[in-house]
């Protein structure tokens, strides 16, 4: 089961908006749908945010309120440097990501602050099980090492 928590914007700390999917394919459909929506970064009018974090009932958004991750993880990539910028940036980015991470199943989508010259994106990975809160710091450290620390350190989901 893949599950997520939805936040209206960057300031929203309410954790009651959740969704669950019984297959990765259905979860992917949501990701692709969200990626086609027009986004805005930051503030009360920003795009909705999703997180694999599931929270203790009645608690607000904070690390200490997380009880598990819903069988997926992602890396927010805000400072990726393309090896070759002479051609089409999107084509080059796809090529480089495939060369580095093609052995893994993942979904990649751009974030609201992405530009053609400075792509910012999320890599979303299915997991074989949920990650309990007690294991999250070790899991995050291992995942970041595995993926060459390309993820934004401030965003641990």
PLM segments and residue spans:
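Signature for HUH/AEP ssDNA processing cores
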Residues: 1-121, 125-138, 142
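Flexible helix-coil linker/hinge segments at domain or subdomain boundaries
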Residues: 144-157
């Amino acid at each position: 089961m893949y599950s997520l928590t939805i936040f209206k914007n960057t300031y929203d700390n309410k954790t009651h908006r959740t969704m669950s999917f019984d297959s990765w394919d259905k979860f992917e459909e949501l990701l692709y749908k969200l990626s086609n929506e027009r986004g805005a970064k930051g503030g009360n009018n920003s795009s909705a945010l999703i997180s694999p974090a599931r929270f203790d009932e009645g608690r607000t958004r904070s690390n200490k309120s997380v009880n598990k991750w819903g069988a997926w993880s992602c890396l927010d990539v805000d400072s990726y440097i393309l090896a070759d910028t002479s051609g089409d940036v999107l084509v080059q980015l796809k090529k480089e990501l495939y060369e580095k991470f093609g052995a893994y199943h993942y979904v990649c989508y751009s974030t609201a602050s992405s530009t053609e010259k400075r792509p910012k994106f999320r890599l979303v990975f299915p997991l074989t099980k949920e990650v309990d809160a007690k294991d999250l710091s070790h899991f995050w450290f291992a995942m970041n090492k595995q993926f060459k620390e390309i993820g934004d350190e401030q965003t641990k989901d």
